[in-house]
């Protein structure tokens, strides 16, 4: 590993540590109270731990799964001390994340055999969707890849304008039409343009309205179908962007979008301003969709590739 890569990696780690600070402080404050005055893990400690996990937005189903696994360990060792609880919890959360997040990437990469590699981005307005697209474009361009953006969220003039600002900032082309245009038509034009330009990566924004599930499903299905007329088997990735600071609302949004289309990866944003970072653990587990990216700050470098080991390490540091 080069000297510069080491510096970059340590900077990323510091940003991640800082981004999870609020979640960590709140979580371990609650955990300390949960085991106060107790020397061994008993039913009361487990009940308190359950409350801590649920109130940290890990989600009920995932919390129960973690508690069951810890109970199984306690039944094998009746004298398990509360001082060991951190280690056990860390191992169980790492294990859960490993079930869905099988990759171990730390860099922004795409498969070499798919060109252009097409990412369709979905998510409600206000979750940081446009910002995520801009930061992704920046990271891919930094890797020397040729990137094209598509503004297929045509129902909001601001969405097109915001994407144009990011395209100009990063220095990549944006394919767009006027507000109210057919999103599928924009997607078609974007892929046509990408093929002509021999682009490596295409990132297409889509409507951020959780209106009617059937309408949403029909719209996204049409966009996909039209893409496939230009490039077979696209999109290669359907990336759902969720705002980590909304906690349980993020679960509801994931439910709506996974019902409307096949979501293949997640980006969880705004983790730096919240104590609700536990949502990353719960959503990944409940929906069996890998978390690909996390937003841990407002800077252009603060969108990171999600690495389960680094995440757990920062969480329990």
PLM segments and residue spans:
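Short hydrophobic/aromatic residue motifs in ordered secondary structure
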Residues: 60-62, 156, 272, 300
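Short beta-alpha junctions and helix-cap segments that line functional grooves
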Residues: 3, 105-107, 136, 252-253, ...
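Switch/coupling subdomain of P-loop NTPase systems
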Residues: 4, 10-16, 21
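Residue-level signal for short, function-critical loop segments
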Residues: 153-154, 244
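Short, aromatic- and cysteine-enriched interfacial helices/patches
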Residues: 3-10, 28, 35-36
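Short glycine-rich anion-binding loops that position phosphate/pyrophosphate groups of nucleotides
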Residues: 207-209
